[in-house]
From Swiss-Prot:
Keywords carried by this UniProt record: ATP synthesis, Cell inner membrane, Cell membrane, CF(0), Hydrogen ion transport, Ion transport, Membrane, Transmembrane, Transmembrane helix, Transport
Function: Key component of the proton channel; it plays a direct role in the translocation of protons across the membrane.
Subunit structure: F-type ATPases have 2 components, CF(1) - the catalytic core - and CF(0) - the membrane proton channel. CF(1) has five subunits: alpha(3), beta(3), gamma(1), delta(1), epsilon(1). CF(0) has four main subunits: a, b, b' and c.
Record carries keyword Transmembrane: yes
Keyword set includes Iron: no
Pfam families, per the entry: ATP-synt_A
Location, primary (coarse class): membrane
Record-stated family: Belongs to the ATPase A chain family.
Protein name: ATP synthase subunit a
GO cellular component terms, semicolon-separated: plasma membrane; proton-transporting ATP synthase complex
UniProt topology in membrane: Multi-pass membrane protein
InterPro entries membership: ATP_synth_F0_asu (IPR000568), ATP_synth_F0_asu_AS (IPR023011), ATP_synth_F0_asu_bact/mt (IPR045083), F0_ATP_A_sf (IPR035908)
Amino acid sequence: MHSPVEQFAIKPLVSIQVAGVDVSFTNSSLLMLLTVGLAAAFFWNATARRTLIPGRLQSAAEMLYEFVANMIRDNVGKEGMKYFPYILTLFVFVFLGNMLGMLPYSFTFTSHIAVTAALAVGIFIAVTIIGFARHGFHYFRMFFPHGAPLLTAPLLIPIELISYLSRPFSLSVRLFANMTVGHIMLKVLAGFVIMLGVVGGVVPFAVVLGVTVLEFFIAALQAYVFTILTCIYLNDAINMH
């Protein structure tokens, strides 16, 4: 691998053509499937033999449950708990995808705008449907802040509408950009270590190690940010704040 961006190349593992459309099973597909498999295996093993005194897996699952549940309660309220399964699935999928991408010779599917955009657009559509289902045409009121002078409507409504429609763009680009930039930085710094050799590469190696730890933190943080923004959008749809 010579180019820092070569690590993001999607490579077909099993070529599949359907009516002239390429739907091949790729390295990205494999990692997404692995992510789903790991998440399912974790929750299955954590909940299969529940005990009053929890073991390590059950404790981890309970901590994860409370973490996501508190995120929903704090940002949406108790009424948002009905969407807990979706929020939990979203967080675990993005979190594991980011973490698996940190492994050597792995693939970070969250570094592809197509994946993050699909997630963001799905969230946007779901939140919009929830908003209209709950409030009907009154949902349009969120584009005009309560208490604002009527004369400001021609200015505020377009601004609020553009802000609302840009949500899937900002949500997808934030995750995609952070994961892409972080991995490119790691690749470039790792290349310096190899070029400088054992002696000259001591300092760069320490830098790479520090950046790697930071990248793990960013990977976890981005999963949290992605999920909490989803909760905020959901709160807007439910409570119209």
